[in-house]
Amino acid sequence: ASDVYKRQVCDNKFLHHGSVALGAVVCDREHIHQKIRRPLGKPRAWPACYRFRPCAALRRNLPVGKGLTMSSIISIKNLHYTYPGDEAESLCGVSLEIEKGSFVAVLGHNGSGKSTLAKHLNAILTPTEGEVLVDGIRTSDEDRLLDIRRTVGMVFQNPDNQIVANVVEDDVAFAPENLGVEPKEIRRRVDNALKQVDMYEFRQHAPHLLSGGQKQRVAIAGVIAMEPEVIVLDEPTAMLDPKGRAEVISTVTKLCREKGITVVLITHHMSECIGADRVIVMSNGNVIADDSPENVFSQVELMKSEGLTVPATTELMFELNKNGWDLPLTALGVSECAKEIAKELK
């Protein structure tokens, strides 16, 4: 497979499930759908339509690199990226540290560079200049792709493009099975992953009969089954209705708070960021804000200048302040907002 295929195809079920981590894989989509339905836990041979070249990381153990702080899992240093054929940079010297166990939301309008940044976190793209370290491993090190993609799992926008099996539990089993995990361990991982996203009772269902939010939760379960330390979600709710969005955000928040999984959420929905530990705002390939949700959203004029909205509670208090009120713009919750307004009315 070409480097363009390996690094730039972003909405691909193999990248989602981590199988590309094993090497360069090219396949016929229809063949997958015809052959994938087999009993869970039984080894599947690679069909003849695959062209497979194992990474060197499968053949030898390599030492973990250096460069992370004690608490960070991802370190980004002076990251520049230009897409082939483009003159303008998509990322312009971005430097960030992502701490273990944190919930980080990345905001920005279309073309801000947020999705390009996401694709650098598990080596779908590699830097034109600078470096990205995942658990101390440079993403530009092709011999370590397996380690990188075992550490960082990806979930993309369209759940229909991420599901490859005809039964929910078979889909969740796809990645660990092709990583060579033992059948009993696969069974444990699948059951555990589906329970974590509240989809265990649907394990025998056909994915195409599920709602959009349920499909995306199955996609997340497929990543959880790989047992990554980090899950990156690139606008996972973009194609969902409000109910589906709420289901997905509730799921990823629980994974972070209860299981300690690091979550990086790429989104343009302000409401999805309120529960994050940290909000990063991007514009034209640069980071223009990086702080707690309260401090970022209180910069209402900055957000509006970038074509972004703020939570409804912040907008309400901002407008009231323009008319002589004195309300804190850091109260993001409805109950907090109501209490602050009640204080002013006394």
Question: What name fits each language-model region?
Answer:
Residues A1-Y5:
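Short, small-residue-biased leader/transition segments that mark boundaries at the very start
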Residues M70-I73, Y81-G93, E142-R144, P183:
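A short, flexible loop at the N-terminus of ABC-type nucleotide-binding domains that lies
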Residues L107-H109:
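The feature captures the beta-strand-to-loop junction immediately N-terminal to the Walker
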Residues N122:
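Helix-to-loop junction immediately C-terminal to a conserved catalytic motif
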Residues K184-F202:
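Conserved ABC ATPase "signature" region
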Residues A206-L210, Q214:
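Conserved ABC ATPase signature
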Residues I231-D234:
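Catalytic Walker B motif of ABC-type/P-loop ATPase nucleotide-binding domains
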